[in-house]
Amino acid sequence: MSLQWLQQTRHELSWTWILLTTCIALTSPLVLKGIYNVYFHPLRNIPGPKLAALTDFYAFYWNWIRDEGYSKQFSRLHEQYNSPIIRIGPNNVHTTQVEFYDVIFKSGSKWLKDKSFYKYFNGLDAMIEPYQYRTYRTHLAPLYAQRAIDGLAPKLRSDLTNSASGMMRQTENGQTVNMAKVLRTLSTSMILHNLFSLDISLNDGDEYHPFLEAFEQLMTQSWLFVTYPMVPMVLSLIPGTSFARFNSSYTTFSNYCTAWNDEDMRKQRESEGQSTRDSHTRRYLSLKDDDARKKTAIPYPLDDVFNFVAGGSDTTAYTTACAFYHILSSPTVRENLVVELDEHSSIIRDEFDYNKIQNLPYLNAVIKETLRISVPVPGSLPRIVPQGGITIGSFSLPAGTGVSITQQAISFNEKIFPLPHSFLPERWIGPKSVGLDKWNIAFSRGPRQCIGTTLAYLELRCVIAYFFSRFDMALTGNCGDQLRWVDRFVAVNLDDVEVQILADRWT
């Protein structure tokens, strides 16, 4: 045995020990944390999958790797564990006790957003502290007040007319109409109108706008981006991968937003106080320099564009597409709706009077039922248990626990909505509907209710009224007997709703 061999062996062993020690040092905290989460955590006795108790990666597995949505598993898990409360993460639970919804989302609620869930969000969605949120919401509120939304009806009418012309051109060419894209174009144009004081048109031609193509691509990676944001950024550097396409889409989306923002800012400054159309950019520029606290609370408009496009257009377009599907899938619903629209055709075709359209009872029932059954924001939006803790059933939850009750848990509760998987607008009409509006919660409730609720209702009512008053349509495409969807923070249909225009009833 030579001295050289001993020295070489000692050198190899030293590197082995270094690597082993490094691995132990890196993994030990994770292992110890996992053991604590499963066996010693205050939530250890709450039923649920052990993997969910072990790590938040379990939710990521369902949300992104399986691309189905963790929230779609909750109903199965509640049934499997025979419990109204289940553990869905190391520090998160989900409950189906509907009375608990009032506790979390009532006015003046002290249940704050879960920082760990929203840490990679920006703008309005990321605001945890009530003061900052109230300041920003108050700053934007006039843009989304009923009076301001009523004033958007002429723009929406113009956009609908342009869309209808495009739909007729496609029909004349023997094509079907992809309503998902038509509706996304309409809803995005409306929210951009509020974001910028510019006349931005996404509907000049029959081609789908590149801005919308880019946005759709970004939404396919939404869970990855809000969970592990550095991963897509690094992987996007690899040529030829889907992440490279993601990077290209992000660049396209960002370039459009930056160009619109810069042009709007320039025009606003050049106007030197002259009256310009109200918008996010105008309101930001109107902030006074001496109000430092307010300026700190209100983000730069460009930082919040994605949130408003996703929350203000994608959810509305998705819901409206679902409405088209359910109306056209049910001859009785379609007939009842068209009869009502025909009886009031003048307020749609001639006057386009939103104040009258919004009072059509069956139209409103169809919209409420669509919001219920489609659940545009289906996932958990966790809130933190305040000081003092709380008891749900037989389980005590300490302060700091993340608690969710999804809209699905409400919308498909058989005690509130008999036959919950059936599309029944009539449930919202007449004596049997008394008290049901309390559970019309698609836009949430309380201080964090969606700021764009009034805009969404304008679009839903007017778009459905216009198209079903004007066109006879039939479903085509691959939707089949039911709509297949996934949870990408907002719900997304896997198959676009497509229709064939049978007749233009206004010609």
UniProtKB/Swiss-Prot annotation:
Binding site for heme: C450
Positions annotated as glycosylated: N247
Pathway this chain belongs to: Alkaloid biosynthesis; ergot alkaloid biosynthesis
Organism domain of life: Eukaryota
GO cellular component annotations of the record: membrane
EC number: 1.-.-.-
Entry-linked InterPro entries: Cyt_P450, Cyt_P450_CS, Cyt_P450_E_grp-I, Cyt_P450_sf, Cytochrome_P450_monoxygenase
Compartment(s) of residence: Membrane
Cofactor(s) listed: heme
Transmembrane segments: 15-35
Keywords: Glycoprotein, Heme, Iron, Membrane, Metal-binding, Monooxygenase, Oxidoreductase, Transmembrane, Transmembrane helix
A Pfam family of this chain: p450
GO BP of this protein: indole alkaloid biosynthetic process
Deleted gene: phenotype: Causes a blockage in the conversion of clavines to D-lysergic acid. Abolishes the production of the peptide alkaloids ergotamine and ergocryptine but accumulates substantial amounts agroclavine accompanied by varying amounts of elymoclavine and chanoclavine which ranged between 10 and 20 percent of the amount of agroclavine formed. Also leads to traces of chanoclavine aldehyde.
Gene Ontology MF annotations: heme binding; iron ion binding; monooxygenase activity; oxidoreductase activity, acting on paired donors, with incorporation or reduction of molecular oxygen
Membrane topology: Single-pass membrane protein
Physiological role: Cytochrome P450 monooxygenase; part of the gene cluster that mediates the biosynthesis of fungal ergot alkaloid. DmaW catalyzes the first step of ergot alkaloid biosynthesis by condensing dimethylallyl diphosphate (DMAP) and tryptophan to form 4-dimethylallyl-L-tryptophan. The second step is catalyzed by the methyltransferase easF that methylates 4-dimethylallyl-L-tryptophan in the presence of S-adenosyl-L-methionine, resulting in the formation of 4-dimethylallyl-L-abrine.
Protein family per UniProt: Belongs to the cytochrome P450 family.
Name listed for the protein in its UniProt record: Cytochrome P450 monooxygenase cloA
Species annotation: Claviceps purpurea
